[in-house]
Amino acid sequence: MQVIATAGHVDHGKSTLVRALTGTEPDRWAEERRRGLTIDLGYAWTTLGSGERVAFVDVPGHQRFIGNMLAGLGPAPAVLFVVAADEGWRRQSQEHLAAVNALGLRHGILAVTRSDRADPGPALAEARAQLAASSLGEVAAVAVSGTTGSGMDELRQLLGDLVSHLPTPDRAARVRLWVDRSFTIRGSGTVVTGTLGAGTIRVGDTLELRGEPVRVRALQSLGQDHQQVQGVARVAVNLRQVAVDDVARGDAIVTPGAWPTTRTVDTRLMPSTMAVAHHAPTDRQPGDLSEIRWSDELAGELMLHVGTVAVPVHVRPLGPDTVRLTMPQALPLQAGDRTILRDPGRQRVVAGALVLDVDPPALRRRGAAAVRGRQLVGASGAPDLVTEVSRRGAARVADLAALGVPEEVLASAAGLVRTPSGLRRAGEWLVTPQRWRQWVDHLTAAVDAHTVASPLDPGLSLEAARRACALPDIRLVGAVAREAGLQLDVGRVTRPGAAPSFGPAEAGLRALESRLQEAPFDAPERPDLARWGLGPRELAAAERAGRVLRLADDVVLLPVTPALAMRVLTALPQPFTTSAARQALTTTRRVAIPLLEHLDSRGWTRRVDGGHREVRGAPSLTS
């Protein structure tokens, strides 16, 4: 399927032409049919001789409904431009072409209607000249009459040629469906419709609306139920548990987590045909912006149109043809999106705005706007991988994809430790060499400083290591530690071979070890430990070093003691009581109970009932 929007002056026969092509009335409202005037978007479809199905979005031509017109034109990949033979090129023809040009649409057909009322030649010649100076360039043209049917077969042939040359959408792309209608169906609930430009929607999918998950209950396209719909297509999506008041034209249904929302974008202005005509001398070359007074054009309150949404926008000039746009609400945009700036007061399209950056740097210092403008010279709307990573120091691959970095560029970096451009790959992150070296140096210094400050605990915890380097992700600690020649063990980063220095407590620790070697189950009391200089910090360090095992109730044993206990318990009649275990181990309840609970936790013993345990497996002394 392909989707084509109409464009042209009011009452030039757009709806009549769509009706003649499809046999369907595109005007949905009784008032539209009564007045013979399209007010809102209309929809119809047909099957061409080639078998290709084409959906039409019929847009209103009247100046008062230009917002509705832009909502229909924005998501469409091609346009059917209509001019009446008996009226020729008119004001709304010019404004609609300005919108087409601002959006950069390159695929279209010119249809001169009402050829049964007047010679179509003059209107055809003028319209061709106007379109040739726009992004459409030289397009196929035909004179038709929706009343007599003259030229309709040729138009259908031209439509077939047009759709066969439209770009093939990426059906694996993330979904962004700009909503142009929402309504309810009894027994089904809320339905939204829109033009799906790329990607695939399936029944049962979880998508996202204003940051909240929504579930796809059912799908229709061109009046038929589908289990999945692939772009490009007109699609109706039945959403579960979404009130009709919670979704409206201008909302976007998107792939969860795949579309960052933004209130601020840096853009390049693309002149509309109206702005060029307003300022241009007759010898202006197409695309020449030198004479356009953007300060005049951008004065006052402007509206930004993108997809099906229209929002007021604050414009801040950056360079000769670049501006920063700030919106009152966050939108799911990416670099490369084409938008329209319109002056509602003067009722005309001012410019197109090509999105260059959806995550631009703050402009805090004096002169920062001019510096930013110079940085954007040559930016194309396809984000450069190295530029985006360099500006941030480090960036997740998923975030770069969401910013609009081409998938093939990101795929080429997959599996590499270093990209050809010198970026470092660590898991899902790409890092500049400078930032990577900074992390390595900071982590090394932090580990050394911690060792000096805490000789009992030479290891830096993962979170402390992350904070020391200002890492954006704790999972980067391991890769940075390896690069620094450090050791990551049991969740701590150390110098290789580093061990706690117990200082004066070393003698006390050896005394403890000596006592427990002679009497493994005779755990010393807290006063004994204190006399040896072994407080909580020293014992915690000794446990991390593998020299002691700490159990509940301040019971301190050797790490081998549980295995020694199992030798004794295995020899008991099974099951056994706590008292029997205590007597066999020749120890106290203070030691026996936490020791048995420890054996339970390791799966070596298990409770049979409230008073009995049994051995499950006898470990070796090295267990």
Residue ranges of model-derived segments:
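Conserved G1/Walker A P-loop phosphate-binding module
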Residues: M1-V59
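P-loop/Walker A NTP-binding module and the surrounding RecA-like catalytic core of P-loop NTPases
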Residues: I4-G8, H12-A20, R64-L70, G88-R91, ...
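C-terminal effector modules of nucleic-acid-centric enzymes and ribosome-associated factors
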Residues: T6, R117-A123, A129, A140, ...
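Residue-level signature of catalytic and energy-coupling elements of molecular machines
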Residues: D11, L17, G36, D58, ...
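Conserved Switch II/interswitch segment of TRAFAC-class P-loop GTPases
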Residues: E52-R53, V59-R64, L73-L97, N101-A123
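Conserved nucleotide-binding/hydrolysis micro-motifs of P-loop NTPases
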Residues: H62-Q63, D86-R90, L105, R114-D119, ...
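Conserved catalytic-core segments of large NTP-driven translation/proteostasis enzymes
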Residues: S115, A129-A275, H279, Q285, ...
